[in-house]
Amino acid sequence: MSRQNYIFTSESVSEGHPDKVCDRISDAVLDAFLTEEPEARVACETFATTNRVVIGGEVGLSDQAKLREYMGRIDQIARDCIKDIGYEQDKFHHETVEITNLLHEQSAHIAQGVNAAEGKDEGAGDQGIMFGYATTETPALMPAPIQYSHAILRRLAEVRKNGTEPALGPDAKSQLSVIYRDGMPVGVSSLVLSTQHLDPDLTSADIRAIVEPYIREVLPEGWLSADTVWHVNPTGKFVIGGPDGDAGLTGRKIIVDTYGGAAPHGGGAFSGKDPTKVDRSAAYAARYLAKNVVAAGLADKCTIQLSYAIGVSKPLSIYADTHGTGDIAPAAIEKAIDTVMDLTPRGIRTHLGLNKPIYERTAAYGHFGREPEADGGFSWERTDLAEALKKAV
């Protein structure tokens, strides 16, 4: 029997966090190539530090002239990302930061294992394990600690960028310790919020006065009480932020990107990777499947694991765990999953429409628990497979 009464903690980071700056640039590069060619191959990594951004990795287009043209756009893509995030500080400014582009063409040896040949479906871009998770504890079928940690930072970014709160800077982190009773979230025992601020004379109390109304706005009513412990900018001043304060790298916030530690993680990052890479596409598929299992009423919680081998199209294994919250045997759910969805790399991309420039928007505030969008963004958050799963079990 799983625990019913406990405290669980998750954190999030803002779009201005150094690692998220890098995720954003990597996904913006990916979107640029997918705009030109839906089958483009991209593995883009970004490093950011004081006054410098380095972009490297592998890319591939069928048209070599177009490939050279797009290579020339990388500098401006990175600057546009930094500008939109809001960095205009002396040692990290979108106009003056030095951009180094080390991207090159994808290895033919990798391509031969992934590309479809006559009579053979394309293989997975790498080996690996991917997890998906869903739970009834929030309307988005996400764990509450990570979902509301994201919501706090997203709201603070909105009021910073629209000019309502000009004292706030782009770099911020949140952390919520959520109280569970009978397995459901009911309150917050402690809250941590650290945000960069542009006025060096602001105190922690000043910052709390700015952010507290927005935090109360996004959290469910009654979750904050007199017993909730607040830590707002607990170290004091936070003026130097972003890549000038700490170096950033693509792919270092994989728990923030997923379930906040409430579910297993296979270890593969998402940003900068085109959807032939199962680190990304199969993790999206696993979330889609888990969410649809829960949306179908087959369980209150569901964890899905998929595994792949490089160059092999079909998953090596499908695993489901409903954590004792459903009446359907996990083995029956596994069989149903294999029946209702093609889990080859191409099958996933086709089913979820992943060969589109829909990735830059995923780079901050979580890849999961978002609303599906009209242009195909966050398609893995749809629940259109629920009825098929119910029939298949």
Swiss-Prot record:
Q: What class of enzyme is it?
A: transferase
Residues that coordinate or bind ATP:
H17, D171, A172, K173, K237, F238, D246, R252, K253, A269, K273
What EC number(s) would the UniProt record show? 2.5.1.6
InterPro entries cross-referenced by the UniProt entry? ADOMET_SYNTHASE_CS, S-AdoMet_synt_C, S-AdoMet_synt_central, S-AdoMet_synt_N, S-AdoMet_synthetase, S-AdoMet_synthetase_sfam
Q: Name one GO cellular component term.
A: cytoplasm
Required co-factor(s) are:
Mg(2+); K(+)
For this UniProt entry, which residues form the secretion signal?
none
GO MF annotations for this entry?
ATP binding; magnesium ion binding; methionine adenosyltransferase activity
| Alphabetical list of CDD domains matching this protein | S-AdoMet_synt (cd18079)
Keyword annotations of the record: ATP-binding, Cytoplasm, Magnesium, Metal-binding, Nucleotide-binding, One-carbon metabolism, Plasmid, Potassium, Transferase
The main location class comes to cytoplasm
Reactions the enzyme catalyzes: L-methionine + ATP + H2O = S-adenosyl-L-methionine + phosphate + diphosphate
The UniProt annotation places L-methionine binding at E58, Q106, D246, K277
Q: In which pathway does it act?
A: Amino-acid biosynthesis; S-adenosyl-L-methionine biosynthesis; S-adenosyl-L-methionine from L-methionine: step 1/1
Q: Where in the cell is it found?
A: Cytoplasm
Where on this chain does Mg(2+) bind? D19
For this protein, the record's Gene3D superfamilies field holds: 3.30.300.10
GO biological process terms held by the UniProt record: one-carbon metabolic process; S-adenosylmethionine biosynthetic process
Residues where K(+) binds? E45
Quote the function comment for this protein: Catalyzes the formation of S-adenosylmethionine (AdoMet) from methionine and ATP. The overall synthetic reaction is composed of two sequential steps, AdoMet formation and the subsequent tripolyphosphate hydrolysis which occurs prior to release of AdoMet from the enzyme.
- Name this protein carries in UniProt: S-adenosylmethionine synthase
Gene for this chain:
metK
